[in-house]
Design a protein with these regions (language model features):
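Acidic, glycine- and Ser/Thr-rich low-complexity intrinsically disordered tracts
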Residues: 144-146, 254-267, 424-510
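Recognizes extended acidic, P/S/T-rich segments that occur
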Residues: 53-95
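Extracellular beta-strand/beta-solenoid scaffold signature
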Residues: 162-168, 184-191, 213-228, 249-270, ...
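Extracellular beta-strand-rich solenoid/capping regions of secreted or surface-exposed proteins
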Residues: 91, 133-150, 158-198, 211-231, ...
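Right-handed parallel beta-helix
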Residues: 127, 148, 152-156, 173-184, ...
Length: 510
């Protein structure tokens, strides 16, 4: 978005001593993806009154880029084998080596590390080319990190005609599934078992799923599915996942004794090992074949959940669900969500709760968001859910919400951050900057307001509903005015919702 200056996010927070002990003092661990590097550091002398300063540059470069100093936030009770301060450097270039320097405030304690982002050109070893078939194709063999096993389905269709549970089953690692059209699986389009480092790209998946006794789709059955907690390094890119065989119920429809939406999903990964990337996909359906969540699964009130640690979700189009467009709930340790467009969903981004963090949400845009009259939680849900599942004690991770936009087509967009039909959810450890929080109705808060909300930092947002009084003083009250030809083009997957130069908030960010 051009209306606010881009914020470079580098967050290093949360001190935790695991039952396995700490890493050696000042040892840095780096976990890269294509455009980000997650960092973990254990400096001697870390404490609540000391921030961590961050700098990075391309290896051999002269100019250091500085990050934001972050808070110290100890969390106990998890067996996750993690380091104290942690966070992410984002907006990086693939296949590029970076020098990273961390310094503990007020001390001479400093350390550096060199880390390289992922290449987008994965090496190919063996290639297996498939033609059309009507039975499941199972992948048992593995490639290596130096030579992936490519299963090439370009121009091939696997239509199992509801006679097999899956179109493709993957049990091998270092595997690329490319170019398939997958149809009519009894349960799920692609099943991932005990595998890692699997790339699913340029696939078209549709028509999967079974029907339950109430006539809705079976819960969690998905275009891409795994219930293995050991999978990690899963990349889903440039896929179209659409039109499951059956519908999910809305919050106004009884299903299996309750009103919570239940039914098919685009992607289901239960409590995975993380380091997953979901990018450049179109996951959508129609009003008669709605998803439960578009992507998600796992245990919300936990240190695990979806999408797993050190994972990225970006540049996707998500639509047509009765609950969450993106269900990023649980640990959210170095989870990064950016540049997605979501519409025809009840709730664009769910994060209840973020128990470890940090969670980054930036440059996402939501369109029409809706649930039928009589829905259990009202017609309009929050843009970002906030709150918790099970216990408020899970709300211990930090969250950073920057440069997002809530659109209000025909006044049918999402509610504010943590706000649905004027119900205000808990918010803790959240920082906002440069968001356009148009809630369409001034009687609804743009950000949840309740006395229990603590350790938050709000500023430089454009808002037209209620806004917490304890803010930084630079937020702007008003309704956005977009350029004359603001648009979203589904066929081209392009959009432009820049602010008009005469609009409040134009060029007024931090």
């Amino acid at each position: 978005m051009k209306h606010f200056k881009q914020v470079i996010i580098m967050v290093f927070c949360v001190l935790f001593f695991s039952q396995f002990g700490n890493l050696h003092a000042s040892e840095i661990k780096a976990v890269p993806t294509f455009h980000a590097i997650g960092l973990y550091w254990t400096p001697d002398g870390g404490s609540a009154d000391k921030q961590v300063f961050v700098a990075f540059r391309i290896e051999g470069g002269e100019q250091w880029n500085e990050g934001l100093p972050m808070k110290y936030n100890p969390i106990g009770g998890t067996t996750e084998d993690i380091s104290p301060y942690r966070g992410s450097i984002v907006n990086l270039t693939p296949n590029t080596t970076y020098e990273i320097k961390l310094t503990l405030e007020g001390t001479s304690i400093s350390d550096t590390i060199v880390s390289k982002t992922w290449t987008e050109d994965f090496p190919i070893g063996e290639t297996i080319t498939l033609s059309d078939r009507n039975i499941t194709y199972s992948v048992f063999d593995s490639g290596t990190k130096d030579g992936y096993l490519l299963i090439d389905g370009t121009n091939a269709t696997i239509d199992v005609e509801n006679n097999s549970d899956y179109c493709i089953s993957v049990g091998g690692s270092y595997v690329i599934i490319r170019g398939f059209t997958l149809k009519n699986a009894k349960k799920c389009g692609i099943l991932l078992t005990t595998c890692h480092d699997v790339i699913i790209e340029n696939c078209d998946i549709s028509g999967w799923g079974e029907k339950n006794e109430d006539g809705f789709g079976v819960n969690y059955q998905a275009g891409i599915y795994s219930e293995s907690t050991s999978i990690k390094g899963i990349i889903v890119q440039r896929c179209k996942i659409h039109h499951p065989r059956y519908d999910a119920n809305s919050w106004a429809e009884l299903n299996d004794g309750g009103y919570h939406p239940s039914g098919p999903q685009g992607i289901t990964l239960f409590n995975s090992g993380g380091n997953n990337v979901i990018r450049y996909n179109e996951i959508y359906s129609d009003s008669e074949h709605m998803f439960n969540d578009v992507i998600g699964a796992g245990t919300n009130g936990s240190f695990y959940g979806f999408p797993g640690p050190d994972s990225d979700i970006y540049s996707n189009y998500f639509a047509n669900c009765w609950d969450d467009g993106i269900e990023a709930e649980g640990g959210n340790r170095n989870t990064r969500i950016w540049g997605n467009y979501l519409e025809e969903v009840f709730l664009p981004i769910a994060n209840a709760a973020t128990s470890i963090g940090p969670l980054y949400i930036w440059k996402n845009t939501s369109g029409r968001c809706y649930s039928p009259p009589g829905s259990y939680y009202g017609v309009h849900a929050p843009f970002i859910k906030m709150g918790f599942v099970g216990s408020i004690d899970w709300m211990t991770g930090h969250m950073y919400v920057f440069n997002n936009t809530i659109l209000q087509p025909n006044n049918e967009g999402a509610g504010g951050i943590g706000v649905s039909d004027n119900a205000n959810r808990y918010i803790k450890h959240c920082e906002t900057r440069n968001n356009i929080l148009d809630v369409g109705n001034a009687s609804v808060n743009s950000i949840s307001i309740r006395s229990e909300n603590t350790d938050n930092n709000y500023d430089y947002d454009l808002y037209n509903g209620g806004y917490p009084a304890d803010n930084g003083g630079h937020a702007i009250l008003g309704t956005p005015i977009y350029i004359k030809d603001a648009y979203f083009d589904f066929d081209e997957m392009k959009a432009d919702f820049s602010l008009n130069s005469l609009s409040l908030g134009y060029d007024a960010g931090e």
